[in-house]
């Protein structure tokens, strides 16, 4: 299945959007199972089970660390661990049982859905 984890807010915060527009941050997208894997890696290394919404940031931080390792750099990597995953144990159980799946949405279906949205002034 699909796990809609975290804070149930799947939009973009205005401040985060503005920081991206200014080029201060980059947006990254990862499949849910890769994020769960990153959360498990973090838990095993740090002893903290991350909240599911934090796993996306953990995944990005791990990817940045691997990039630094490949490039021989010692960059500082900052990410937000928004909370613990103690209330998310059933989702972790589903992950370990192989019940979660990654889905790829068809670009044509996405374009059709977006075309049906009303125009909103900026």
Language-model regions, residue ranges each:
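Claisen-condensing/thiolase-fold acyl-transfer catalytic domains that form or cleave C-C bonds
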Residues: 32-96
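Active-site/ligand-binding loops adjacent to catalytic centers
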Residues: 1-48, 94-122
């Amino acid at each position: 299945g699909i796990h809609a984890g975290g804070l149930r807010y799947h939009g973009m915060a205005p401040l985060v959007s503005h920081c991206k527009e200014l080029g201060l941050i980059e947006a990254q997208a990862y499949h849910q199972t890769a994020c769960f894997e990153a959360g498990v890696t973090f838990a095993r290394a740090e002893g903290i089970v991350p909240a599911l919404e934090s796993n996306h940031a953990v995944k990005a931080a791990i990817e940045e660390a691997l990039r630094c390792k490949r490039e021989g750099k010692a960059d500082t990597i900052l990410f937000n661990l928004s909370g613990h995953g103690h209330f998310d144990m059933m989702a972790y159980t589903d992950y370990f049982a192989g019940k979660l799946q990654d889905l790829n949405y068809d670009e044509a279906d996405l374009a059709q859905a977006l075309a049906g949205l009303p125009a909103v002034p900026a």
